[in-house]
Amino acid sequence: MEKFIKLIKDKLGDKVTLVFDKKYLSDYVGAIQGKADVLVKAETTDDVAAALKLAYENDINIVIRGAGTNLVASTVPEGGLVLDVSNLKEIGQIDEFNQSIEVGCGVKLCDLQNFVESKGWFYPPDPAEKEATIGGNISTNAGGMRAVKYGVTRDYVRELEFVTPQGNVLKFGADTIKDSSGLNLKHLVIGSEGTLGVVTKARLKLIPKPAYTQSALIAFTSLRKALDALPTLFAMSLKPTAIEFVERKVIAIGENYLSKEFPCPEAEAYLIVTFDGSEQDVLDAFNIA
């Protein structure tokens, strides 16, 4: 390990340190503590490529780390190298003609969404953890509540810059709606959770920002009636943006914790339904629902 640390320090200089910050040894839950021998804080794709190449040649374990919001210990190292890619956080200009934007893997989802929405655009994937990085979203094919209408991360990745374990930098995909030339390796990488290499950049599809969004709480006297309502909602001309099912047992826990009563206390189940679109379309949808 001493030989490897010297090699990687010679290559990457002060971007290489020992692991003093305990956040690199755990995940967001903090229940499991790992161990690591060295930390690389990459700032460019070349840094990532150099670190991966040296680790591969010297048979060193690697854990890739973005925002560290993972809840299942997959970012907990078991010795070797922690490669922090959170500094690859450049947000490019919006390509309005192709309706896309290029971002670094370290860009936080919330920062991307705030940026594009301030320009009148919309990036739909909406997993629960908004502080997660785009690289993490791609590696896990994150979805979220809006997947009901808009799909998951995979549906919004046009192009990927990807570094293999051997340190080769590859590009997959194209900034087009349809690309049927060759093997679709982009989709092999998406959802692979870092097992095939490291995503360093991505060009993401955007859509125009919906003009109006509204949610409603619908109460039901039984769980069965709530579930039976779902086909009707999905058959509507304006598809729901998100649907969340909540049963009375869960509500009771929240009421006890917050010391507040939920609306319609006699209900056994609830659907929280969100629609987006033009204001009139959304209002019409709620009238039908």
Predicted region positions:
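Noncatalytic alpha-helical scaffold of FAD-dependent oxidoreductases
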Residues: M1-A289
